[in-house]
């Protein structure tokens, strides 16, 4: 698979990348970059699902595609999704003695065995083939499509965020499939555990693509070294511009003194006028040459400074500072006492659960999909009330989910801030949003226009910069739709948060980097015995 001088555009004509040349073989390649840079578009070009605006794509062999979000049709069955409905019907006709000669020739006698093996490998061993795909959870649908790819065995596997919405067990299964795939793999993911299993990383930006050999940890080591070098270059450039400015000022002062001295000497000299004029012209030309040299030097140093600032600003622009909450150590933040949550038909979703948190404790909640983690977070944040038991929450709490649902798509950021902080003023809203990097006209953007990372940043701004920042922050899969740079910025911001924290995330690196104090395990709505509340 080769991309030759490829360019890509958005539907409205905005350029994503130009003159991109890449080759993909049997190695495992991850594509990383900021949201909106064109990672999914690149994958679609590789998979043959899109055509480049310029350049060409050369393919040899078969390609399998696993999209980030695929909606099954209403009548689509498990067999349809696996891609075996037709071959399976042929096999069943032959086995029932109803097959034609063509059926006999086409029958795949190992199909059922291979199909069951593929389903078992992705944790769906007992799945009925006639079951509707739409009835499966999102994670189960991803597993099912992966089983279909294992059956098809393409030469090149193309995966777009394959671990999104999967629990830790399913994410580990995806990583194993990637590591063991006999052909080539090209993937986009913000799952750093998965990125550690690849052979190389392609860093995509508006400037093109840079290829880094090795997995995620080696890439980060090189990237951090480059960032440190950029900071050093900026410091040197700032010192150089200061030095040039001082030298220029001193040279101008010396020239001014020489000019004054020359004028005084000319006025008092008895030399012929033609000689004095020649001396004045030589002095003027010498001064002009010095000024031109100084100007060229100043321009060169300013160019170095601009370049150094741009390199550093790309990193610094995501830096966030969380305001202090003033939560005292040891203060009671939350006490759940035999709390139960049920739905209208009295079906129990959660509990009974007892859990006690004190400030500024950090707790991670883990468990399989469907265990009740989101319900528990809503109970902790006060968004649902217990059907039985008691909840004590003596501090202000706020819940941020992966969609930042507290924000309305049609409102501007200033409007959102004022709605969530009704005692504030428009000037206070703009100042607060600026702290979270929404400056000037950025504060007038509508929520619906924001990327996932921007939306989470806006939600943090609205929640954390009011008169009373929450002393208990509850996070439900906050990194699901973020690029890695945004995830790292959120990690850095939350590391400086001095309140209590409860987080659900399938991102083990995110949990580790938040330095949680303990992890509680939830399964079928119950805290597991290994949990110490």
Cite the ranges covered by each PLM segment.
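ABC ATPase nucleotide-binding domain signature region
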Residues: 25-29, 40-102, 200-203, 359-371, ...
